[in-house]
Amino acid sequence: MAEPLKSVDYEVFGTVQGVCFRMYTEGEAKKRGLVGWVKNTSKGTVTGQVQGPEEKVNSMKSWLSKVGSPSSRIDRADFSNEKTISKLEYSNFSIRY
């Protein structure tokens, strides 16, 4: 049986703007075969949604909360609306503006 698909929303706090965080997030998501999006918020955080096989989503959550882009400093990452989905709602991973 195929691995269950999972969807999760995220928001990352810390020094995450002006440090290529979105570009690296897009790269890491694509490397894992995940879909979704990422964007900067007006309050200095980075937010988005990621979808894909459960194990890959969990790996991405770990990257978002502990690794980030080389110049970033992550204070914390909040995850919400985590749920199992029957099909992906996006065809790729994109940076939103």
Curated annotation (Swiss-Prot):
One of its GO terms (molecular function) is acylphosphatase activity. It is an enzyme of class 3 (hydrolase). Residues 7-97 form the Acylphosphatase-like domain. The active site is at 22, 40. The keyword Phosphoprotein applies. Its physiological role is not yet clear. Belongs to the acylphosphatase family. This is Acylphosphatase-2. It comes from Rattus norvegicus.
